[in-house]
From Swiss-Prot:
Residues modified as Phosphoserine: S86
Organism: Mus musculus
Function summary: Growth factor of the TGF-beta superfamily that plays essential roles in many developmental processes, including cardiogenesis, neurogenesis, and osteogenesis. Induces cartilage and bone formation. Initiates the canonical BMP signaling cascade by associating with type I receptor BMPR1A and type II receptor BMPR2. Once all three components are bound together in a complex at the cell surface, BMPR2 phosphorylates and activates BMPR1A. In turn, BMPR1A propagates signal by phosphorylating SMAD1/5/8 that travel to the nucleus and act as activators and repressors of transcription of target genes.
Subcellular location per the Swiss-Prot or TrEMBL entry: Secreted
Disruption phenotype: Heterozygous BMP2-knockout mice show abnormal numbers of rib pairs, a reduction in overall body length, and less bone mineral content and volume than wild-type mice. Homozygous BMP2-knockout mice die before embryonic day 12.5.
Protein name, as recorded: Bone morphogenetic protein 2
Length: 394
């Protein structure tokens, strides 16, 4: 969608919301907008409402308005990722591996594994479990750049102060699952790491080759095998170290904080990759502007006012701004005009049939949004041309 169309959608938003759009905007959101308005607005036609809904949902890459349940939990990993890329104070320190992955992607998706975890037959000194992530919600036109499997490992009390307590975690792709005539599945090693048991932390494993085969090459997704190779005499200690399944008495909230997570980084071809948003400094002009001249004006979009805060996790709203004002003859330097606008304004001064130059955005920037999609999956996406940074006569 071109920048002009997006700006038009922002300006049309209050009118369309007050008019209805029942399939997109909840009744509560429409009532809030209606109560805030001091003058009645005419109801747009159903065709206009339908077109607006289609364009807005298309801009967000959605086919229908998400209606997530209240039990959906946003992984802390995704919240930290959003804070980092939106430039929020107190965000976690940059992770170089993560920064490289995000530098080529404009969409990050997270997936929890299916709760039913299959424990595979034990081999000497090893514990292995199979688990599965449903990736059917990844759009077919999204180009995958990388994928990571996040697994939490807990500190073992017996290992405190002893750095020799180690084990190896191996991650395999299942090529062919176990069957009646096949005791163990056929697997391919994806990543491996030697870890200490005396600390609690997340471990990230590169599973890009497997996820690319499943999502873009048409191979069947049989899941992963997580194998813990015990390097000590007591394998029972290490077995509790890697958290793949929920404990019997563990509550849902605490389990959601350490539950295994598959994270995909992709690009839909519709903008720039994720980046840390830097606050821009206002450009001060020496020349005094007329109050009515073309300039940027405040416009804050509050998602809670329109009932979108049930599926948009962050931000709660954003400063979109808009451009408005006169482009008088002669056009001053501070109006950021093109040569064509100068010529058009000159012709308008002698022939009123030719319209004046218009006050429009000349520079736009992106925002990062964290939201729940139609499948209740948590998505972090970079949306282009959402914030007006500069205005001019064009």
């Amino acid at each position: 969608m071109v920048a002009g169309t997006r700006c038009l959608l922002v300006l049309l938003l209050p009118q369309v919301l007050l008019g209805g759009a029942a399939g997109l905007i909840p009744e509560l959101g429409r009532k809030k907008f209606a109560a805030a308005s001091s003058r009645p607005l005419s109801r747009p036609s159903e065709d206009v409402l339908s077109e607006f809904e289609l364009r807005l949902l298309s801009m967000f890459g959605l086919k229908q308005r998400p209606t997530p349940s209240k039990d959906v939990v946003v992984p802390p990993y995704m919240l930290d990722l959003y804070r980092r890329h939106s430039g929020q104070p107190g965000a976690p320190a940059p992770d170089h591996r993560l920064e490289r992955a995000a530098s080529r992607a404009n969409t990050v998706r997270s997936f929890h594994h299916e709760e039913a975890v299959e424990e595979l037959p034990e081999m000497s000194g090893k514990t292995a479990r199979r688990f599965f992530f449903n990736l059917s919600s990844v759009p077919s036109d999204e180009f995958l750049t990388s994928a990571e499997l996040q697994i939490f490992r807990e500190q073992i009390q017996e290992a405190l102060g002893n750095s020799s307590f180690q084990h190896r975690i191996n991650i395999y792709e299942i090529i062919k699952p176990a069957a009646a005539n096949l005791k163990f599945p056929v697997t391919r090693l994806l990543d491996t790491r030697l870890v200490n048991q005396n600390t609690s932390q997340w471990e990230s494993f590169d599973v890009t080759p497997a996820v690319m085969r499943w999502t873009t090459q048409g191979h069947t997704n049989h899941g992963f095998v997580v194998e813990v190779a015990h390097l000590e005499e007591n394998p029972g200690v290490s077995k509790r170290h890697v958290r793949i399944s929920r404990s019997l008495h563990q509550d849902e909230h605490s389990w959601s904080q350490i539950r295994p997570l598959l994270v995909t980084f992709g690009h839909d071809g519709k903008g720039h990759p994720l980046h840390k948003r830097e606050k821009r400094q206002a450009k001060h002009k020496q020349r005094k502007r007329l109050k009515s001249s073309c300039k940027r004006h405040p416009l804050y979009v509050d998602f809670s006012d329109v009932g979108w805060n049930d599926w948009i996790v962050a931000p709660p709203g954003y400063h979109a701004f808009y451009c408005h004002g006169e482009c008088p003859f002669p056009l001053a330097d501070h109006l950021n005009s093109t040569n064509h606008a100068i010529v058009q304004t000159l012709v308008n001064s002698v022939n009123s049939k030719i319209p004046k130059a218009c006050c429009v955005p000349t520079e736009l920037s992106a925002i990062s949004m964290l939201y729940l999609d139609e499948n209740e999956k948590v998505v972090l996406k970079n949306y282009q041309d959402m914030v007006v940074e500069g205005c001019g006569c064009r």
